[in-house]
């Protein structure tokens, strides 16, 4: 049986960009959100083989440490011409300093080396797996994706991560050029475009009630 989120919720991330997006998505539901960083929680090793298992690892670790329901996202970009890379290693490609400019440059260099210059050779998709874990090990898990094409040079300064080089299908602008409302569909969430917002819509249907 599904379980509703009430009261305080730990957001199990130390990524400022991801934290801001999650708080924005949670805002209509009146949830008191506190980050793992604010609580001084350490980051667990992400040893899973896919996005869903890594999200669960982070949520469970935060729930056990904080004794509170904890919400985690594991997301990344999957590039067809790079055999699915960077995938679950998307954050690691940015290194310890979270240098996504360098990570995007690395992707572009690899695409050029493989001759992937035409739009149909530059297909990619973002994946977001969301997990809410309770201290008693109850889990609620969802996953979503958004397909698109990689552009170069990167465009826009909104969002974070690989957003400036990802143009979602059916649009002329990158995520980096879109406002939060355009990217997340806020409000209403039913218009969600991004992978994280689409996953959040699924999670909200089973775990959240608007205030």
Curated annotation (Swiss-Prot):
It catalyses: XTP + H2O = XMP + diphosphate + H(+); dITP + H2O = dIMP + diphosphate + H(+); ITP + H2O = IMP + diphosphate + H(+). Signal peptide: none annotated. Its EC number is 3.6.1.66. Pfam families: Ham1p_like. It is an enzyme of class 3 (hydrolase). Mg(2+) binds at residues 45, 74. Gene3D superfamilies: 3.90.950.10. Substrate binds at residues 13-18, 75, 160-163, 183, 195-196. One of its GO terms (molecular function) is ribonucleoside triphosphate phosphatase activity. One of its GO terms (biological process) is nucleotide metabolic process. It comes from the Bacteria. Binds 1 Mg(2+) ion per subunit. Its cofactor is Mg(2+). The keyword Manganese does not apply. The active site is at residue 74. Keywords: Hydrolase, Magnesium, Metal-binding, Nucleotide metabolism, Nucleotide-binding. Homodimer. Belongs to the HAM1 NTPase family. NCBIfam families: RdgB/HAM1 family non-canonical purine NTP pyrophosphatase. Pyrophosphatase that catalyzes the hydrolysis of nucleoside triphosphates to their monophosphate derivatives, with a high preference for the non-canonical purine nucleotides XTP (xanthosine triphosphate), dITP (deoxyinosine triphosphate) and ITP. Seems to function as a house-cleaning enzyme that removes non-canonical purine nucleotides from the nucleotide pool, thus preventing their incorporation into DNA/RNA and avoiding chromosomal lesions. This is dITP/XTP pyrophosphatase. The lineage of its organism: Bacteria, Pseudomonadati, Pseudomonadota, Alphaproteobacteria, Hyphomicrobiales.
